[in-house]
């Protein structure tokens, strides 16, 4: 891991530029994705079948995954995995149900009524990667908040495979997916955004994917809503001398194994801990099955910063605004209020980040690349709309006429003013 020195502002700028470099867009990819989107818009199902044969090497006779195939997955899944998914589902549901919020209504003055309605999005599409990147936990994290929000129809797409990963189909059934289609890549995102003869057009698309999927989501944004454009996974760990280097090293590697572009950042006020963590990382890498991914990730993108004190550690990490933030300090909860920017926080020596990935209930779809400065984890709020309503009586309009027309004339919008004036007592 590379060590950085300097002021917090200087270090945070270096880290941000490095992260942008890891997340930068590929213009060749964008050109390819634009072509795919246009083809799907023009040819619909025919284009989906052609791209499935080209990219996935699968000849599709049927795009829809039947209920029979889904139900058979329950016979094939490992029973311990099924139990774990059921328990994780319960935790995710109990957490996200607390995010439900109702509308409001008030009467600030005589004859004036104001309010806000909360309405679920009608139809949502969830993208689920296939192959070695098949993550049933992501199915739960994307679908359950939508279901709790009251989304009427949830469509899931996943790349076609000769044999589906049973846990993916089981997770979809447990979470409440209504229909599953075997289509992936940029072509799948295009199908969700514009609809085809078989796939219905959705109102919002969520879910992780490779650079082609992420680019497609970016290009269809505006036609549909999206959750976010996520960059490589990242973890920031604030640790002092009370931290266990074995735990810290394991947690840094838990993100490094995701992707060669993943980031792992340790900020500590203990040089001894920093040294011990580096030694422990090398030791743990020796037996890690995904060493081929984790080693280049940690060597190229891993960073250690020695801070002067606890205050400086939190100041720097707030500038970094990591996706995942672990606070490996005794009585970590006492430091919670010091955090201004983070996607999700993990408190104390025993709260490893994977607890949040799989089980605790808080969502694992999180803002990356310092976007936690202005955005949040996926939740129920992402699947609802807020609709305002207003009602004024004739007397209330007359009482407010002067202020409203004054503002309208000040902006040079005479028709706005007249729309109020025609309703006054003189008319």
Swiss-Prot record:
GO terms for cellular component: cytosol. Substrate binds at residues 233, 255, 258, 324, 357, 411, 416. Its EC number is 1.1.1.23. Binds 1 zinc ion per subunit. Keywords: Amino-acid biosynthesis, Histidine biosynthesis, Metal-binding, NAD, Oxidoreductase, Zinc. CDD domains: Histidinol_dh. The keyword NAD applies. InterPro entries: Ald_DH/histidinol_DH, Histidinol_DH_CS, Histidinol_DH_monofunct, Hstdl_DH. It is an enzyme of class 1 (oxidoreductase). Pfam families: Histidinol_dh. Zn(2+) binds at residues 255, 258, 357, 416. Pathway: Amino-acid biosynthesis; L-histidine biosynthesis; L-histidine from 5-phospho-alpha-D-ribose 1-diphosphate: step 9/9. It catalyses: L-histidinol + 2 NAD(+) + H2O = L-histidine + 2 NADH + 3 H(+). NAD(+) binds at residues 127, 187, 210. HAMAP family: HisD. Catalyzes the sequential NAD-dependent oxidations of L-histidinol to L-histidinaldehyde and then to L-histidine. PANTHER family: HISTIDINE BIOSYNTHESIS TRIFUNCTIONAL PROTEIN (PTHR21256:SF2), HISTIDINOL DEHYDROGENASE HDH (PTHR21256). This is Histidinol dehydrogenase. The lineage of its organism: Bacteria, Bacillati, Bacillota, Bacilli, Lactobacillales.
